[in-house]
Regions:
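Extreme N-terminal starter segment of soluble prokaryotic enzymes
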Residues: 3-8
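Conserved N-proximal alpha/beta basic substrate-recognition cap immediately N-terminal to
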Residues: 15-127
Length: 127
């Protein structure tokens, strides 16, 4: 049995995505085309417990439709170590929640490819 390819996206609320300017939907559509299953979560959905980094994720299907651009298939608790890639898409306010998410994700950074790694944004904040 082939292991499924999972792209986990950490982003802002789905309701706040502007499909005219935000490339998150485009990236998710391309990942789907390449056979990835998309799991989406917000920074506050992350947890680190008993050595595991998990997130309360939405299993999503994305569409090209700008008005209804996603469908929630299910909600699940997901061990992020099982993701092939974690894509960081949210813009920080540089607050405690953001800092917590950077520290949590650092625990799996050597085992999961993290694109736009949080610690690089924390350590080299350009604002």
């Amino acid at each position: 049995m082939m292991k499924k390819k999972i792209l986990a996206i950490q982003g802002s609320s789905l309701k706040k995505i502007n499909t005219n300017t935000d490339t998150t939907v485009f990236l998710a559509l391309e990942a789907q085309r390449r056979g990835y299953q998309i799991y989406y979560f917000e920074p506050q959905d992350l947890s680190f417990l008993s050595g595991k980094v998990t997130a309360k994720c939405f299993d999503l299907t994305f569409f090209k439709n700008k008005k209804k651009f996603y469908k929630i298939n299910k909600k699940l608790d997901f061990n992020l170590i099982k993701a092939k890639i974690i894509l960081i898409r949210n813009e920080p306010p540089f607050d405690q929640q953001y800092i917590n998410s950077t520290f949590i994700l650092e625990h799996i950074a050597k085992k999961v490819k993290i694109i736009k790694r949080s610690n690089s944004r924390k350590n080299w904040n350009h604002k």
